Amino acid sequence: VWTGVAKVMRDRGVDDLAFVQHEAAQGELFAFGISEAGNDLVLFGSDTDAAPDPDGGYRFTGTKIFTSLAPVWTRMGLHGLDTTSPDGPWMVYAFIDRPEAGAGDAASIVTRDDWNTVGMRGTQSRTTELHAAYAPANRVARRVAPGPNPDPIVFGIFSVFEILLAAVYDGIGARALELAVATVQKRRSKQSGTTYSQDPDIRWRIADAALAHDAIAPQIQSLARDVDGLVDHGARWFSLLSGVKVRSTETARKVVDDAIRVSGGSSYFASNELSRLYRDVLAGIFHPSDDESAHATMAAALLGPVATPTDKPA
């Protein structure tokens, strides 16, 4: 995600994350330290405290969840809320290094061994505790006002994260459809003696899954081109990006479900690839933007914000 964010920002004339691209090319592994339990503000707020120091750096204290590749990352990009600076509050985006084992600051970052999940087990997205974890001044990328914000780093994270997520889950749907097609061409009906690929109900279900699946990739590709092409969607950007993520993850769930329905009881065994896809695709409902957030974002883009009791009718 972070290398993509660096590109989006550079394309818009902001080179604050050039070091991310250089270090990633040298083999450094950048973790994504944004998610926090119960923080539905996501990029617009944080429960992690960002305490400034006199040298311009920050110390972060809080808990991040779903930190992918937790056992092996070497850098973490994260955010926190600075409530103590005189000109604040600020949302602070910065990067911290993983301390060497036995180093004096080793206890500042604790990786819990808690990734015991239904699916996506290979990502090892464990919980990370931050205890005054330090980002020096040259690794403090941006300070932006809390709340919805068009700052390049906010747009960069949102656009790259949503588009990449949509692509991953679209890929899960594609693989499930591929497995379903292969399976029904081999399974035979005792009643008819023909393969299930000749059964009209099976054919309809696979076709229905494929029709839904085929609609997603062009949407992902179109938005990705718009991001790269600096297209200005204005206030619609966040609704477009959250929308494609939700449509992709929800469609992938339907496609996987249909694939299992036509593939028979063998797909219920844990050793079956469709069983793994069934477990993995469920994670899509937990990634931001969730269904509720996407609907709220779309409504705000089209209808404006919800009126407060003191607002007068237009």
Language-model features: locations:
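Glycine-rich phosphate/cofactor-binding loops in nucleotide/flavin-utilizing enzymes
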Residues: 265-314
